[in-house]
C-alpha cells in the first residue's frame, strides 16, 4: 500500500481538490479529506482527522496536505503528527502539489522523499505568465544607535504598560483569521495566549508558538503570569493581542488589574452542556456568569469572527436564550 494522504482545508475545498486531481489521474486510493466549517474547532477537526485515518492504511506513513500555515486544519494535524514517526504536515496545498504527490506515491518513494517532492512541486507550480523578476534594492546599513543613559526607577504611569490592541475569546486560538486579518489590522507585534490549561500542555504550547505569522511572536502563559507581564515596564508601549479560550479567564485577568476596555468574541464551539447563541458562539452557565461580570465593569463585549463582520452585542445574544 502507498503512503496515506489526508487533505484538510477551510470550507469545502478539500473534496474539490481531490476531485480535480482525480479528473487528471483517475480515482485514487488511500486518500482522505476533511472540511472545516463555522462552529468547529481544533478538537472537532482532530476527531474528523482520526475518523479518516481509521479508514486508511497508515503503515507507510501519513502526509497531511492543508491550506494555510497556522490555520485550524494545520493546527489540528500538527497535534496528531507531533509524536509520530512518518507523519508530516505540509501547508499550501495546491493542484500541482497534490497531482505530483499522488503520482509519485506509485513509485514507492521513501517518506522523506515524498515530503520533499510535495514541497518542491507546490512551490514550482505557482507562476505568473507575464511578470518579470523584480530586483530588490539592498538595504542601507543601519546607523549605530547612541547609548542611552540609565534612568532611575519610577512608579508606573498610564503609559508604562503594554498596549492591548485586541483581546479576543476564540477557542481555536491562533488560526487563519487571527494570523491574517486580525494581526495585520490591529498592528500587534506579539500574540499572547492566556490560559492555564494550554500553558500546562507542553505539546500544544510548543505548536502555538510556531504558527505565528511573519514578524509576530507568539507566547503561551497562564493567567497569573500574564498579570505579572502586564505590570512589567519592559513591555511598555508594545502592542499585543491577547487570546483566550473562555470569558472566565478574561474576568480573572481583569480582576487581577489588567485594563481591558473591549473584548471581541470570535468563536466558542458548541459541545454538550452549551447553548448556541449564533453560528460561531456557544455558552454555558459559567460563561454567562463571566460575561455578566465583565459587562458590569463596563467592558464592551462584541461578537465578530472577522473585523468586517457587523458587531453583535454579546449580552443581547445571551438575553435571547430561553426566550
Swiss-Prot record:
GO molecular function annotations of the record: kinase activity; protein homodimerization activity; protein-N(PI)-phosphohistidine-mannose phosphotransferase system transporter activity; protein-N(PI)-phosphohistidine-sugar phosphotransferase activity
Sequence positions bearing Phosphohistidine: 10, 175
Compartment(s): Cytoplasm; Cell inner membrane
Pfam families associated with the record: EIIA-man, PTSIIB_sorb
Keywords recorded for this protein, A-Z: Acetylation, Cell inner membrane, Cell membrane, Cytoplasm, Kinase, Membrane, Phosphoprotein, Phosphotransferase system, Sugar transport, Transferase, Transport
Domain PTS EIIB type-4 span(s) in chain numbering: 157-320
Keyword Phosphoprotein: yes
Site feature location: Involved in the phosphoryl transfer between H-10 and H-175: 89
Record EC number: 2.7.1.191
Active site, per annotation: 10 (tele-phosphohistidine intermediate), 175 (pros-phosphohistidine intermediate)
Effect noted on mutating residue 175 to C: Loss of phosphotransferase activity
Induction / repression: Expression of the manXYZ operon is positively regulated by the cAMP-CRP complex and negatively regulated by the Mlc transcriptional repressor. Expression is also weakly repressed by NagC.
Domain annotation PTS EIIA type-4: ranges: 2-124
Segments of this protein annotated with the region Hinge: 137-155
Effect of residue 86 to N: Loss of phosphotransferase activity
Membrane topology: Peripheral membrane protein
CDD domains given in the database record: PTS_IIA_man, PTS_IIB_man
Catalysed reaction, written as an equation: D-mannose(out) + N(pros)-phospho-L-histidyl-[protein] = D-mannose 6-phosphate(in) + L-histidyl-[protein]
Role according to the record: The phosphoenolpyruvate-dependent sugar phosphotransferase system (sugar PTS), a major carbohydrate active transport system, catalyzes the phosphorylation of incoming sugar substrates concomitantly with their translocation across the cell membrane. The enzyme II ManXYZ PTS system is involved in mannose transport. Also functions as a receptor for bacterial chemotaxis and is required for infection of the cell by bacteriophage lambda where it most likely functions as a pore for penetration of lambda DNA.
Subunit description: Homodimer.
Protein's recorded name: PTS system mannose-specific EIIAB component
Organism (species): Escherichia coli (strain K12)
